[in-house]
C-alpha cells in the first residue's frame, strides 16, 4: 500500500492547472460516482485469497499509512480527478478492484465519545486501548499505556514518523508518547528527545525553536547534542546521512499543501514533499537487521 498512498496524494500535484468545473463533471463522471466508486469498501467485495497473501509469513517492516480525516468521498474524488486528468483512475481503487488488499472497517469511538479525535484515534489504533478525546495513551483514570512505537523500539526495531502537520501533532504523537493533552506540543517535543527514535519529520518549528517556545529551550541544539542530524530545508534533508538519526522540521506549523508547493518554485526548493520525507525515512531504516516500523501521515486532509 505504500506506493498506493503516495500515488493518491501525488496525483493532485502532477497537474499545475485547475480544470474548469464543467469539464471536471462532464461525460458521465457523476454516473461513475454513483455506480462504481460510491463505497470502495463495498464495491468489488470478493473473498480474499489468504493463501496467496502468504498469511503465515512474518513481516520484517511495518508502515502505517494515515490519511487523517479522509472519507470514502475523498478517495472517490481523487479517483475521479485522476480519471479526468490522466485518463486512468487511482492506484488505490485499482487495488480494490483487483482484490489485492485486505480491507476492514472499525468502530473508532473514543472512551468518552462516539465521535473520536485524532489523539484518541491514533492511541487506540496504535495501542489497542480506547482513551478519552484529547489524550495520548492516557486513560480516563490516568492509566498510561505503552505507545506502539516504544514497544517496537524496545524490541530492537528502528522506528519513526513523517507527516505533513507538526511532528508533535496528535496522530504521530499517539504512536509515540503519553500525554494528558494533545495540545502539550512543547512537552511532546521534549519527550521525543528522550525516546531516541530514528526518524521524526514534519512541521512544527514553533515547538522546537528557542525563540518560539515558552521555556526558551533550544530543542534543535538538544537533538544535535544527542547525535541527531537536524534538517530545516529540503536540501538539508536530502543530504543527511543514513547512518545517523534525523529530525526534520520544515514549517512553522504544518507544511504547505502539495498544490501550493507545486505552484511555488521556492517552496519546491525548500520544503520536501511527503513522498520525499517518506523515502528518506525508509532509506535511513531499511538496512536495519531487525527491520523498522514507521507511521506516514497525510495530516491536512480535513483542515
What are these regions (language model features)?
Residues 65, 162, 202, 250-252, ...:
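Generic beta-strand/beta-sheet core signal
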Residues 32, 43-244:
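N-terminal catalytic scaffold of extracellular/periplasmic and nuclease hydrolases
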Residues 16-25, 50:
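Twin-arginine (Tat) signal peptide motif
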Residues 181, 270-278:
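Phosphate/oxyanion-binding active-site loops and adjacent basic polyanion-contact surfaces
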Residues 1-18:
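Short, Lys/Arg-enriched N-terminal segments with co-localized hydrophobic residues
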Amino acid at each position: 500500500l505504500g506506493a498506493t498512498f503516495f500515488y493518491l496524494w501525488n496525483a493532485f500535484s502532477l497537474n499545475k492547472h485547475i480544470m474548469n468545473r464543467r469539464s471536471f463533471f462532464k461525460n458521465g463522471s457523476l454516473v461513475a460516482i454513483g455506480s462504481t466508486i460510491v463505497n470502495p469498501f463495498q464495491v468489488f467485495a470478493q473473498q480474499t485469497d489468504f493463501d496467496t497473501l502468504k498469511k503465515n509469513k512474518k513481516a520484517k517492516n511495518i508502515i502505517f499509512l494515515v490519511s487523517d480525516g479522509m472519507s470514502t468521498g475523498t478517495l472517490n474524488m481523487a479517483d475521479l480527478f485522476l480519471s479526468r486528468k490522466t485518463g486512468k483512475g487511482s492506484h488505490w481503487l485499482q487495488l480494490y478492484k483487483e482484490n489485492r488488499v485486505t480491507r476492514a472497517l472499525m468502530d473508532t469511538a473514543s472512551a468518552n465519545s462516539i465521535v473520536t479525535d485524532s489523539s484518541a484515534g491514533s492511541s487506540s489504533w496504535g495501542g489497542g486501548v480506547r482513551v478519552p478525546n484529547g489524550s495520548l495513551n492516557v486513560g480516563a483514570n490516568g492509566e498510561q499505556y505503552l505507545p506502539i512505537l516504544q514497544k517496537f523500539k524496545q524490541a530492537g526495531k528502528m522506528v519513526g514518523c513523517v507527516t505533513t502537520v507538526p511532528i508533535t501533532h496528535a496522530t504521530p504523537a499517539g504512536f509515540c508518547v503519553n500525554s494528558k493533552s494533545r495540545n502539550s506540543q512543547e512537552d511532546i517535543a521534549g519527550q521525543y528527545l528522550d525516546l531516541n527514535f530514528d526518524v521524526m519529520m514534519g512541521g512544527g518549528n514553533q515547538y522546537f525553536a528557542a525563540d518560539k517556545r515558552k521555556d526558551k529551550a533550544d530543542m534543535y541544539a538538544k537533538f544535535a547534542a544527542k547525535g541527531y542530524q537536524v534538517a530545516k530545508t529540503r536540501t538539508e534533508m536530502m543530504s543527511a546521512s543514513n547512518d545517523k538519526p534525523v529530525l526534520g522540521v520544515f514549517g512553522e506549523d504544518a507544511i504547505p499543501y502539495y498544490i501550493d508547493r507545486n505552484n511555488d518554485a521556492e517552496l519546491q526548493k525548500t520544503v520536501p514533499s511527503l513522498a520525499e520525507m517518506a523515502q528518506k525515512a525508509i532509506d535511513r531504516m531499511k538496512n536495519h537487521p531487525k527491520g523498522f516500523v514507521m507511521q506516514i501521515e497525510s495530516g491536512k486532509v480535513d483542515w
